[in-house]
């Protein structure tokens, strides 16, 4: 059945405008993005099918171009649209932490770092560079590695911190395994980076480890 043949209150776009986006299911939100279905399937039915094939909305959003376009009803144009939506989301979250003290708004910082790192298939090491009032100057992935390790060089963290005239930094990296518990190697590299940046009067304020649905803070553990 075409969406136009559904009662108005059941059409995703009309429902969103009347009740707000939180009232919609994942399939209804995706249907608005898709706009049209395929032969024999309306946009909601196609969205529901795609969510089952990918396993979740998050997996669909984090899929690469080859995986995304291998599904019927999706193509490069839709992939480009999706990447634009994802990038706008990341920029929106960055703007929120950029305008605030990263320590007095830890939930915004955690949300941003989770969005940036959680769904990466390889380990990535991210640094937030802060000024002397702990406002964000820049955020950057400095190192990327394999599925379970990224080589991290303290001297490069020092160099980039000086480049951005940072007074403090927040470290973060993901565990593609999904388990956020820091390893002994994580603790050692944090200590090495802390020691290195302290030589140029820069402080490490925290190190977040991002897992699947969990985030561990070194500062909250008393390790920094």
Curated annotation (Swiss-Prot):
Motif (JAMM motif): 173-186
UniProt-annotated binding residues for Zn(2+): 173, 175, 186
Molecular function as annotated in GO: metal ion binding; metallopeptidase activity
UniProt xrefs under CDD domains: MPN_DUF2466
All residue ranges annotated as the MPN domain in the record: 102-224
Biological process according to GO: proteolysis
Protein family membership: Belongs to the UPF0758 family.
Name by which UniProt lists this protein: UPF0758 protein VF_0126
Transmembrane portions of the chain: none
Keywords (A to Z) from UniProt: Hydrolase, Metal-binding, Metalloprotease, Protease, Zinc
């Amino acid at each position: 059945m075409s969406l136009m043949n559904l009662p108005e209150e059941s059409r995703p776009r009309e429902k969103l405008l009347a009740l707000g986006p939180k009232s919609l299911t994942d399939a209804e939100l995706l249907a608005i993005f898709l706009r049209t279905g395929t032969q024999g399937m309306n946009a909601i039915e196609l969205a529901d099918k795609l969510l089952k094939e990918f396993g979740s909305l998050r997996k669909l959003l984090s899929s690469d171009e080859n995986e995304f376009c291998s599904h019927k009803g999706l193509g490069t144009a839709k992939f480009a649209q999706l990447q634009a939506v994802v990038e706008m989301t990341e920029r929106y979250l960055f703007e929120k932490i950029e305008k605030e003290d990263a320590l007095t708004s830890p939930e915004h910082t955690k949300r941003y770092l989770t969005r940036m790192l959680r769904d990466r298939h390889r380990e990535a090491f991210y640094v937030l560079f802060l000024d002397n009032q702990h406002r964000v100057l820049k955020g950057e992935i400095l190192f990327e590695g394999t599925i379970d390790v990224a080589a991290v060089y303290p001297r490069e963290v020092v160099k980039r911190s000086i480049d951005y005239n940072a007074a403090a930094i927040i470290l973060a990296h993901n565990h593609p395994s999904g388990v956020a518990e820091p390893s002994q190697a994580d603790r050692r590299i944090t200590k090495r980076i802390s020691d290195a940046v302290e030589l140029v009067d820069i402080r490490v304020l925290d190190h977040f480890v991002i897992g699947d649905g969990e985030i561990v803070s070194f500062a909250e553990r008393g390790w920094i």
